[in-house]
């Protein structure tokens, strides 16, 4: 699949990427190569392949959750400049 210069410019615009005019042919070649590779992958028969979420069949060893610090929420709420319904009130930064 060969991309036109206008298509490369459109892709760059959508990606909000500024590219130089003299770099467009190189980007067109690279993107065309990538799209050709994707087309080749689409032609591969994967009917006998089991779908998987990760290539390695590894199990994560997770530790049990345990409290490591005392709950100091009330203390922090008491010294906060402003709170409401258990939430910290902060100055508005977006108008």
Curated annotation (Swiss-Prot):
InterPro entries cross-referenced by the UniProt entry: Asp/Glu-ADT_sf_sub_c, GatC
Enzyme Commission no: 6.3.5.-
Keyword Nucleotide-binding appears in the UniProt entry: yes
Pfam families: GatC
Single annotated GO MF: asparaginyl-tRNA synthase (glutamine-hydrolyzing) activity
Keyword annotations of the record: ATP-binding, Ligase, Nucleotide-binding, Protein biosynthesis
Enzyme class: ligase
Reaction catalyzed: L-glutamyl-tRNA(Gln) + L-glutamine + ATP + H2O = L-glutaminyl-tRNA(Gln) + L-glutamate + ADP + phosphate + H(+); L-aspartyl-tRNA(Asn) + L-glutamine + ATP + H2O = L-asparaginyl-tRNA(Asn) + L-glutamate + ADP + phosphate + 2 H(+)
GO biological process: glutaminyl-tRNAGln biosynthesis via transamidation; regulation of translational fidelity; translation
Entry function: Allows the formation of correctly charged Asn-tRNA(Asn) or Gln-tRNA(Gln) through the transamidation of misacylated Asp-tRNA(Asn) or Glu-tRNA(Gln) in organisms which lack either or both of asparaginyl-tRNA or glutaminyl-tRNA synthetases. The reaction takes place in the presence of glutamine and ATP through an activated phospho-Asp-tRNA(Asn) or phospho-Glu-tRNA(Gln).
HAMAP family hit by this protein: GatC
Subunit structure: Heterotrimer of A, B and C subunits.
Entry similarity comment: Belongs to the GatC family.
Protein name: Aspartyl/glutamyl-tRNA(Asn/Gln) amidotransferase subunit C
Taxonomy of the source species: Bacteria, Pseudomonadati, Pseudomonadota, Gammaproteobacteria, Chromatiales
């Amino acid at each position: 699949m060969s991309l036109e210069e206008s298509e490369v410019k459109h892709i760059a615009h959508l990606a909000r990427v500024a590219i130089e005019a003299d770099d467009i042919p190189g980007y067109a070649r690279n993107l065309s190569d990538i799209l050709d590779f994707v087309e080749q992958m689409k032609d591969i028969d994967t009917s006998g392949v089991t779908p998987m979420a990760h290539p390695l069949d590894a199990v994560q060893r997770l530790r049990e959750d345990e409290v490591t610090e005392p709950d100091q929420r009330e203390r922090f709420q008491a010294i906060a400049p402003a709170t409401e319904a258990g939430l910290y009130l902060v100055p508005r930064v977006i108008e």
